[in-house]
Amino acid sequence: MLNNIVITDEERKLFLSWTALDEDLAEVEPDLAEAVLRSRLDFARGDLSRTDYWHDPEGIDVFEDVPYVDDGTRAHRLDLYLPHDSVVRGGKTTPVYIDIHGGGFVYSYKELNRNFCTNLAKLGFAVFSVNYRPAPETDFLGQLEDVAAAFRWIRIHRHEYPIDQNNVFLTGDSAGGTLALYMTAIERSGKFAKAMGVGQSGLTVAGSAFVSPLADLTPYLALCEPGTRKTIEESKETSIVEHIAPTFFAKLHAKKTELTNLATMAEEVEFPPILINTSSDDFIHVESLKLATALVAAGHDVELHDWYTHKGQSLGHVFPVCMSWLDESRETLRMIHDFAYARI
């Protein structure tokens, strides 16, 4: 219990199956720890109503909790979901998606995205789902370094699995979309990789599919300026990303690079084909539109799916990931499939 925040034993047992709670907050300053824990609990209680729908479709082989860094930590593990037919046939032809989960940079592990990943695998993909350290355990650049380490592990070990050795696509939702965007840029641009201080893995990214990505970091980098730190009372009116921004983005802000500007990023990086999915009632709807606009203005190949929600209807944020059983989600998964298969 932190500052009278109550977590029942039942909640703790269940929520820990897909997210950190307070076990990494003991050394964190109290107001930040409280904001993070409240956000994790709010997110987890929201996801709880969907757990009855979580299941693995038939015909998917699962390789769980493979360490990509041998340090024994949960945050440095990945899963691989493979169509059983690919295992039986034993070829090297199944194209690859690497999924990076979201959660406001503070919430969830790969388990939260399992339903999305297994349903994507069912359509004919090998899907790697990667963990990374949540904030405040590390910062934005630390999360990029974690994901890059997972990418390097995949490059080194991919020959051990019946998967395509060349066709690798990325996907990520919300904050995971941010990490997927930045990792796409890192893998496609030595200049961008150097600016971030994150080494390239050697994987060739053939395309990326972003679901409701948080694309524009410039408002959060501005919060790293002196005197902008919000108190816990003020932060109740803002997002968890705004609350963690002064520390979470501090090292990125210190780099003073123009490459975090979407227009500059789009002009400087040789992006592969990009798919972006959002909905009109996505609370960060504008982020997808800003990213698509910047990429199109720079001449990149962009496929934008902007679902319009009518009165009485709701799709919301990252709906294909958190509610993969919806008809709209199944159609989105099919579009993500078609996007990749058209480019292999």
Where are these regions (language model features)?
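Alpha/beta-hydrolase superfamily serine-hydrolase fold, recognizing
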Residues: 1-344
